[in-house]
């Protein structure tokens, strides 16, 4: 008899909890969409020019805090604590620990599992780019540029344009336009520098098309990140609502008691 009363109270509390959750305020949907009209960014419209000037005082091809091709804390080709052909710690080959003919082997670096899990969950953080993350690869969008020549040129050269974008977490921006503007700036800058370093140059038509392609991908990336961010917030609200807390506390009381 007592067990039936306890089961009835648990059922009542469970129904009350879900009824309270159903009355929660619905989250707003992000604005904007694919190719919804004219450009939303100032400074566009100049033929052949870059419509997204880089911010923060850095020039094209200069990452934050250092020059391209310069690693942190040392030059290329210089290992830590010794020269090439020498093991760590200053010992010579074949001299190790008092035994004859042993090779001194450098210790293997330990993998930080927290960093691996964070990169898998939110995208890889790009070193030297001020905390930007690299999004997953996308299919390049089909875009019409208003002329047969440009449409054909885009179809023939789209493989030369980026299919991933750099971005920061959406909670660092007040709206979609700010996210997309910053995303386009850093992605176009990084792709242009990387490609020109390999000896390939872009024409004015290429720059125009790269900006359009990257803009569409940045909008898609924002919508994806915003939805994931909203779902995480909904989970926090779910488990922090008073009825759910009361139900969990009651169940723990029954288990412990």
UniProtKB/Swiss-Prot annotation:
Example of a GO MF term: microtubule binding
Membrane topology: Lipid-anchor; GPI-anchor
Record's signal peptide: 1-24
Binding site for Cu(2+) 4: 88, 90-91
Sequence repeats mapped onto the chain: 54-62, 63-70, 71-78, 79-86, 87-95
GO cellular component, one term: nuclear membrane
Binding residues for Cu(2+) 1: 64-66
Binding site for Cu(2+) 2: 72-74
Region (Disordered): 28-113
Disease per UniProt entry: Found in high quantity in the brain of humans and animals infected with degenerative neurological diseases such as kuru, Creutzfeldt-Jakob disease (CJD), Gerstmann-Straussler syndrome (GSS), scrapie, bovine spongiform encephalopathy (BSE), transmissible mink encephalopathy (TME), etc.
Domain notes: The normal, monomeric form has a mainly alpha-helical structure. The disease-associated, protease-resistant form forms amyloid fibrils containing a cross-beta spine, formed by a steric zipper of superposed beta-strands. Disease mutations may favor intermolecular contacts via short beta strands, and may thereby trigger oligomerization. Contains an N-terminal region composed of octamer repeats. At low copper concentrations, the sidechains of His residues from three or four repeats contribute to the binding of a single copper ion. Alternatively, a copper ion can be bound by interaction with the sidechain and backbone amide nitrogen of a single His residue. The observed copper binding stoichiometry suggests that two repeat regions cooperate to stabilize the binding of a single copper ion. At higher copper concentrations, each octamer can bind one copper ion by interactions with the His sidechain and Gly backbone atoms.
Family as reported in the entry's similarity comment: Belongs to the prion family.
UniProt-recorded name of the protein: Major prion protein
Gene this protein is translated from: PRNP
């Amino acid at each position: 008899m007592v067990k039936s009363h306890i089961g009835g109270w648990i059922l009542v509390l469970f129904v009350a909890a879900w009824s309270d959750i159903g009355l929660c305020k619905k989250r707003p949907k992000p604005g904007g969409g694919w190719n919804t009209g004219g450009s939303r960014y100032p400074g566009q419209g100049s033929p052949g020019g870059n419509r997204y000037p880089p911010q923060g005082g850095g020039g094209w091809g200069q990452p934050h805090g250092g020059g391209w091709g310069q690693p942190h804390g040392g030059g290329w080709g210089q290992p830590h604590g010794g020269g090439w052909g020498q093991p760590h710690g200053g010992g010579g080959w074949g001299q190790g620990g008092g035994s004859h003919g042993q090779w001194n082997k450098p210790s293997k670096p330990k993998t930080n599992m927290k960093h691996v899990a964070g990169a898998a969950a939110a995208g890889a953080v790009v070193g030297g780019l001020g905390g930007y993350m690299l999004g997953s690869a996308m299919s390049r969008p089909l875009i019409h540029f208003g002329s047969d020549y440009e449409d054909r040129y885009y179809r023939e050269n789209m493989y030369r344009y980026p299919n991933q974008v750099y971005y920061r977490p959406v909670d660092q921006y007040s709206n979609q336009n700010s996210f997309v503007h910053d995303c386009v700036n850093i992605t176009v800058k990084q792709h242009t520098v990387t490609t020109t370093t390999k000896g390939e140059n872009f024409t004015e038509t290429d720059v125009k098309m790269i900006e359009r392609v990257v803009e569409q991908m940045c909008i898609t990336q924002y919508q994806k990140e915003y939805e994931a961010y909203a779902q995480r917030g909904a989970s926090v609200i779910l488990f922090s609502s008073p009825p759910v807390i009361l139900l969990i506390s009651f169940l723990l009381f029954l288990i412990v008691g």
